[in-house]
Amino acid sequence: MLKIKNLTKVYGDKKAVDNLSLHIRPGEIYGFIGHNGAGKTTTIKSCCGILQFEEGEILIDGTSVKEQPLACKAKLAYIPDNPDLYDFMTGIQFLNFVADIFKVGAKERQECIRKYADMFESFCC
């Protein structure tokens, strides 16, 4: 599912992630534990395509984050500890906004929103 090969991310003259390799197979659960500045968030953001990295390769289900970032973003999500939500939008408006960014068609969008609204027992559409 997730394969990281020799990941290196540098900020200025500081290596935030230095030659990290990791393979997480389907069904496995991993946690990133470490002190502030250890590279946990940088690694996760790199996996999600939010941050560019200098060296290495990240594959999501065999798809390269560098070569096909949108395909990878469709399979993986990142929820930050301080999400930047738009206070002027409802939840449904925000989901439609994100669907617009990723060019999700109207039919698929409605199906997905309904599916997850039902799953989480939320009011929908």
Residue ranges and their predicted role:
Residues 96, 100, 107-125:
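Conserved ABC ATPase "signature" region
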Residues 14-15, 70:
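Short coil-to-beta microelement around the adenine-binding A-loop and adjacent beta1/P-loop entry
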Residues 56-67, 71-72, 76:
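Conserved ABC transporter NBD signature motif
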Residues 48:
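Helix-to-loop junction immediately C-terminal to a conserved catalytic motif
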Residues 35-39:
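Walker A (P-loop) phosphate-binding loop of ABC-type ATPase nucleotide-binding domains
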